[in-house]
């Protein structure tokens, strides 16, 4: 079995029953599938793509570093750990400050996973803005200013000692500007779409609706899996049966 397919199956099993923190109507597995897709799109090797599927497993499920190492080896474990917060007992600010400094030290393969993770999250955030018609950060424990600081700082850490013109870094920067600029760039709206404000808004909405649909399509493109569950919800065990 290819390493990426094995990682995908493991992620499906590990995140079974979980939903997105920001959107309770969506299964958690949408996000790692999206991250892996982004990494593949930008041409990264199979181990990096596999780590994209697995990047939230240690942080958000019962599975441990040993589980990743025993199933996927040292390289993929290292890639996953590059996008895993080490000490959840620290405050949000402390954890993010540590992450910002640690990302600077990573090589490009490790940075790519962090970048793809942030791209996926920001696309989801912008989709929510489009749905509700406004930029609302109230769903976050830390609001606009802290989120803006974190994403902009992570971007600076990603391009540290790297070429800022690497396509995925450029795309991340565009998404950060889109998400955290409260005043719209009026050139496109007022000059290109002069007198056609409704058409501009519709086109923008359609674009991000398409992004959302493509994320969902990647989920529905998965082959059928059978998941066997034994035990109680707290102590139960899930087994993936192809």
Predicted regions and their residues:
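Active-site helical microenvironments for divalent-metal-assisted chemistry
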Residues: 1-194
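Walker A (P-loop) phosphate-binding loop of P-loop NTPases
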Residues: 234
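Phosphate-binding P-loop
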Residues: 217-224
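Hydrophobic anchor at the beta1->P-loop junction of P-loop NTPases
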Residues: 229
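N-terminal pre-Walker A segment at the start of P-loop NTPase domains
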Residues: 192-217
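Walker A/P-loop
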Residues: 238
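Generic low-complexity, intrinsically disordered sequence content enriched
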Residues: 176, 186, 207-210, 220
């Amino acid at each position: 079995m290819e390493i990426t397919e094995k990682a995908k199956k493991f992620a499906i099993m590990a995140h079974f029953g979980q939903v997105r923190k920001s959107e309770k109507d969506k299964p958690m597995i949408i996000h790692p599938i999206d991250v892996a897709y982004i990494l593949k799109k930008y041409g990264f090797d199979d181990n990096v793509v596999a780590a994209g599927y697995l990047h939230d497993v240690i942080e958000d499920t019962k599975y441990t570093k040993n589980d990743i190492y025993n199933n996927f080896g040292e390289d993929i474990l290292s890639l996953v750990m590059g996008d895993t917060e080490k000490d959840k007992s620290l405050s949000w600010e402390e954890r993010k400050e540590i992450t910002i400094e640690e990302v600077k030290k990573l090589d490009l393969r490790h940075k790519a996973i962090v970048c793809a993770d942030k791209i996926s999250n920001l696309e989801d955030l912008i989709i929510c803005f489009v749905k509700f018609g406004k930029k609302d950060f109230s769903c976050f424990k830390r609001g606009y200013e802290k989120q803006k600081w974190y994403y902009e700082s992570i971007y600076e850490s990603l391009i540290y000692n790297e070429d800022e013109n690497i396509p995925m870094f450029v795309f991340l920067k565009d998404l950060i500007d889109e998400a955290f600029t409260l005043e719209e760039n009026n050139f496109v709206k007022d000059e290109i779409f002069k007198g056609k404000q409704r058409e501009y808004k519709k086109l923008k909405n359609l674009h991000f609706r398409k992004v959302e649909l493509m994320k969902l399509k990647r989920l529905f493109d998965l082959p059928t899996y059978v998941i066997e569950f034994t035990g109680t919800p707290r102590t139960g065990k899930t087994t993936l049966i192809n």
